[in-house]
């Protein structure tokens, strides 16, 4: 594709000088199979957005480009708290610090950047391409690639010549605030064999949610809480700033070393959802809401040759720190309304107090990974890639829920005013050996087989819960033991292992081994068309349930059967690709909110997902391009989810109508929490996008007009029948974006309007605590309202 350095100069010059003519679609080179090849030669369902496309679509963040990836859906509570899904592989309620690992792997170049609270909120600038690889990629990418892989590939240092660029942008949101960003890069050759590339950015996203005046009266104490001191319009603004530096050294003709260092800080205020009961884009928040998220990553890639074999080493070290504060008034209010919990909150003089809670979090991540792989020449009839992968990630979790002026008898030891404390260390480790072998049976028929053997070990240790006085051991009137207390009462004298914890009531480890497989048969109909069939599997490691009465959850497996095609017509004037898939999700991990709002994970039997996805690009002339993509996905349970396990600790499925509850000696009956046939949540049956771009001369300038439409159908909010009844479906929506620009030589000026018709997209419906408690007040996560902006870009340097 045309590189960023030519975005204004070559493109605008060509548009000015040349009449309309038949064109070709630019074919992107990808590395989704651990080697560079044309996207049209890869027998995988993949969509890639190259440098030009990222610039044309005004993309700077995940929320900007996910619209153009029809197989990808997501849930997001903040710009730095996003969980993504491929092809409908979602059960809901993901992203908790003590819950399942993600089912999608996210990579920055060669290094995985997925953490338990979601992937890094990487700013998109000076990026070569974004690759969305659908379906299990368990042989080449491993544990975090159960349903797909998202790869962000940066532009690399280039010793062949000097390049530089700068971009300035300002925008305004309808009934919201002003935003702006400054970005720039320099590629500077040091010698014929070395170059350095420096990239920097600052971005301010204006707010659009208003914290309006409101109050809550707690029925037990009749104390009224008001948010008058926190009332503010457009209070959810975001600042993002960071830099990236990469050095390339060609040691000789065969060996190259590329170290990279990247750092970013994101500061957000407010919340990114509104309360329809309060008003459109309005909320009532009674405590400050903010998050400070910073990370840095040091990485190194070494590429070389040993004889006719290609060798690659990729290693990375990542540190991430998230400090946050959030209002938890809904929890306190509804527990008082429904259960009278306000009676437990009084000061040292035993006067009832305001029971409002707020949350303070301090999450510290350390992650490092190493991969070594070797591959044979790709022009041979028999070829292979093989390697070793090691990954380690540690998460120190500090989360405390604070009630001001609470009686000290109920405080967590060493933590004033803290009603609930989580001080835990989570460690996830995995090792793998992998190989993939391809054999050309004929000139047109290729068989590929791959296997990955893995070993994981995951642990969770530390403290969670209440003070022993607030949640003690329980005895009946005869002094007979009824049940254990929680929190400090459950420590039983175990000393603290995690710093700042009062004691230890959780210390559990799970480990397992296994393997994933892939078989692919590809037939080249001719030089421009292929068809393929694939069988592949992916997995997600098991883990620890922090509630001690629950068993660990085991690894879940995704089995994928896929048939696809890739075609180019009329000398690459028209590209059409597609894939049919049928997936079986075995023992899938299902997180629910249990007692005290604790996340519990069970393996919920089985689900099936089938669908079709396609993308196309048409360039009838060198001035006009039409591109689009869509997916149709249907996923549902194939067995009941009863909500408890049998005597063998296996999720119970035999509850067609109602069954005795074994946890209460059978004195009540329970229907299935999610009956067989229940649709999987969050993912719409249809998601699609269409973009048209027309480039033309305008006097001595080059100009363009562009419009894009993206949308999706409705989707269930939850897998659980009761929760779905309360939350309902997430509504369908369609969003339109338009832009127009002019440029000459090395500059371009673009005006744009995003969400032109001010559509209020229903992206995520949720409540602040367990739905049975807080379900009468649901929040809606939404997109940014209509945004009008102007961007100026300039590029310097000669590519050739």
Which sequence ranges carry the predicted segments?
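Transmembrane beta-barrel wall of Gram-negative outer-membrane proteins
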Residues: 174-269, 296-297, 365-391, 425-438, ...
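Gram-negative outer-membrane beta-barrel transporters
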Residues: 447, 582-584, 603-719, 791-798
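Membrane-embedded beta-barrel scaffold of Gram-negative outer-membrane proteins
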Residues: 183, 301-329, 524-540, 554-641
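Short acidic/polar hinge/loop motifs at secondary-structure boundaries
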Residues: 96-97, 103-104, 109-134, 182-184
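N-terminal periplasmic accessory domains that precede
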Residues: 62, 83-85, 107, 120, ...
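C-terminal beta-signal and adjacent terminal beta-strands/loops
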Residues: 709-720, 741-800
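Structural signature of Gram-negative outer-membrane beta-barrels, strongest in the C-terminal barrel
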Residues: 248-253, 262, 374-377, 389-391, ...
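Solvent-exposed loop segments that connect transmembrane elements
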Residues: 208-234, 269-286, 327-360, 400-423, ...
């Amino acid at each position: 594709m045309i590189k960023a350095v030519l975005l204004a100069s070559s493109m605008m010059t060509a548009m000015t000088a040349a009449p309309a003519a038949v064109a070709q679609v630019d074919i992107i080179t990808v590395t989704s199979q651990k080697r560079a090849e044309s996207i049209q030669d890869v027998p995988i369902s993949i969509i890639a957005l190259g440098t030009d496309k990222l610039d044309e679509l005004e993309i700077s963040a995940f929320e900007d480009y996910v619209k153009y990836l029809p197989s990808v859906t997501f849930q997001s509570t903040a710009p730095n708290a996003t969980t993504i899904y491929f092809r409908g592989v979602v059960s809901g309620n993901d992203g908790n610090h003590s819950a399942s690992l993600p089912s999608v792997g996210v990579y920055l170049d060669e290094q995985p950047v997925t953490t338990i609270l979601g992937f890094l909120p990487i700013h998109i600038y000076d990026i070569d391409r974004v690759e969305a690889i659908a379906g299990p990629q368990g042989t080449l990418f491993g544990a975090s690639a159960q349903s797909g892989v998202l790869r962000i590939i940066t532009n690399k240092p280039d010793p062949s010549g000097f390049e530089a660029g700068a971009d300035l942008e300002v925008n305004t949101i309808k009934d919201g605030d002003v935003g702006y960003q400054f970005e720039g890069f320099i590629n500077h050759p040091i010698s014929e064999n070395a170059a350095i590339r420096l990239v920097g950015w600052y971005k301010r996203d204006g707010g659009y949610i208003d914290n309006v005046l409101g109050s809550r009266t707690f029925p037990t104490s009749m104390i009224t809480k008001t948010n008058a001191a926190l009332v503010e319009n457009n209070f959810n603004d975001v600042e993002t700033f960071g830099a990236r530096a990469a050095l390339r050294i060609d040691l000789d003709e065969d060996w190259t070393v590329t170290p990279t260092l990247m750092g970013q800080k994101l500061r957000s205020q407010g919340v990114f959802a509104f309360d329809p009961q309060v008003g459109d884009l309005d909320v009532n928040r009674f405590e400050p809401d903010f998050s400070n998220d910073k990370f840095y990553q040091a990485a190194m890639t070494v590429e070389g040759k040993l004889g006719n074999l290609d060798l690659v080493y990729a290693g990375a070290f990542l540190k991430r720190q998230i400090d946050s504060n959030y209002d938890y008034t809904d929890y306190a209010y509804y527990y008082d309304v429904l259960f009278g919990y306000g009676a437990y909150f009084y000061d040292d003089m035993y006067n009832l107090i305001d029971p409002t809670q707020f949350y303070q979090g301090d999450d510290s991540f350390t992650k490092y990974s190493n991969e070594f792989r070797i591959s044979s020449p790709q022009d041979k009839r028999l070829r292979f890639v093989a390697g070793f992968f090691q990954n380690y990630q540690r998460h120190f979790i500090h989360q405390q829920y604070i009630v001001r002026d609470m009686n000290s008898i109920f405080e967590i030891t060493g933590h004033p005013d803290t009603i609930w404390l989580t001080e835990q260390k989570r460690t996830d480790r995995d090792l793998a050996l992998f190989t993939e072998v391809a054999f050309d049976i004929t000139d047109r028929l290729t068989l590929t087989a791959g296997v990955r053997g893995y070993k994981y070990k995951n642990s969770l240790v530390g403290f969670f819960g209440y003070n022993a006085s607030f949640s003690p051991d329980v005895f009946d009137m005869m002094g007979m033991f009824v049940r254990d207390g929680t929190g400090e009462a459950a420590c039983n004298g175990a000393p603290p292992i995690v710093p700042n914890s009062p004691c230890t009531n959780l210390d559990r480890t799970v480990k397992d081994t296994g393997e994933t497989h892939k078989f692919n048969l590809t037939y080249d109909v001719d030089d421009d068309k292929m068809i393929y069939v694939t069988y592949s599997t992916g997995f997600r490691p098991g883990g620890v349930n922090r509630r001690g009465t629950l068993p660990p959850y085991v690894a879940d497996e995704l089995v994928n059967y896929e048939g696809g095609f890739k075609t180019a017509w009329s000398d690459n004037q028209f590209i059409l690709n597609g894939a049919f898939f049928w997936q079986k999700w075995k023992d899938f991990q299902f997180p629910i909110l249990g007692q005290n709002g604790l996340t519990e994970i069970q393996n919920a039997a089985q689900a099936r997902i089938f669908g079709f996805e396609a993308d196309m690009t048409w360039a009838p002339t060198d001035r006009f391009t039409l591109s689009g993509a869509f997916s149709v996905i249907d996923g549902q349970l194939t067995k009941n989810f009863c909500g408890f396990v049998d005597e063998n600790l296996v999720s119970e499925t035999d509850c067609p109508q109602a069954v005795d509850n074994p946890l209460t000696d059978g004195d009540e009956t329970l229907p299935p929490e999610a009956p067989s046939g229940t649709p999987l949540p969050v993912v719409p049956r249809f998601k699609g996008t269409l973009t048209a771009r027309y480039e033309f001369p305008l006097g001595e300038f080059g100009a363009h007009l562009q419009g894009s439409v993206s949308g999706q159908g409705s989707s269930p909010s939850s897998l659980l029948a009761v929760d779905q009844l309360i939350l309902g479906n997430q509504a369908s929506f369609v969003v339109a974006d338009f832009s127009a620009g002019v440029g000459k030589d090395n500059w371009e000026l673009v005006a744009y309007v995003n969400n032109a018709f001010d559509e209020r997209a229903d992206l995520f419906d949720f409540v602040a605590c367990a739905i049975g408690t807080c379900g009468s007040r649901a929040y809606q996560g939404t997109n940014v309202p209509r945004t009008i902006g102007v961007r100026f870009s300039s590029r310097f340097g000669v590519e050739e």
